[in-house]
Swiss-Prot record:
Keyword Signal in annotation: yes
Low complexity composition bias: residue spans: 129-147
Residue ranges, compositional bias (Basic and acidic residues): 75-128
Entry GO CC: acrosomal vesicle
Top-rank taxon: Eukaryota
Signal peptide per UniProt: 1-17
Tissue: Testis.
Protein name, per record: Acrosomal protein SP-10
Post-translational modification comment from the UniProt entry: The N-terminus is blocked.
Pfam family of the protein (one): UPAR_LY6
Encoding gene per record: Acrv1
Keywords of this entry: Repeat, Signal
Disordered, as annotated region: 50-176
Amino acid sequence: MKELILLGLYLLGSAQGAPPGQPEELLDSVDQQASVQQLSSEYLSLANPSDAEALYETPLDEKTLSGHSSSEQESSEHAVAEHSAGEHSSGEQSSEHMSGDHMSGEHLSEHTSEEHSSGEHTSTEHTSGEQPATEQSSSDQPSEASSGEVSGDEAGEQVSSETNDKENDAMSTPLPSTSAAITINCHTCAYMNDDAKCLRGEGVCTTQNSQQCMLKKIFEGGKLQFMVQGCENMCPSMNLFSHGTRMQIMCCRNEPLCNKV
């Protein structure tokens, strides 16, 4: 092939009509062309399919490696992203679980507090249920005490009323037949002076039925001014004070001459 190229170059040079006096220049040009052809032949020899495949394999390998690296990087990034998403999901799930536990804890605490409240309410109801019974017992006790006091008061009043009735009966009832013959004489007198002397009406009166001997004294300025004594049907004993005047009334019965001065 080299020879063919040289022959073509020679023919090309002869066709151009090179002068026969320049064979050396022609040879130099042929040598240069030969070197160029050699370089081109080396280049063409490099263009062998196996070499070309080798040359192409290197970029393909690099591309494959780069693609593999990029795919690995993408897959690793995808895996990292999925792992991160999984961790995020698991974190959310764990947080939800924790929140669920927290909610369940709160629910349990609320349930416990409700049970505690219900227990306190039950105990309060029990205590309040016992308290009315105690209060009822205490109320029964004061009522009993009050009834005892009332009964005591009533009994005392009844005794005092019976005593008064007895006294009144003794005062109001006539003397028995045995003492009927015994008359009670009351001294009568009126308008007595300071010397306790009767001015008039001095005498004796005999009590009858419920009559009593009565003695009435009137004092003015601390001195006895007027005095009356006799028999009276109604004779309450009393002391009256009015404007410096004092009136004293004394009554007696079943005693002869009880109002005698």
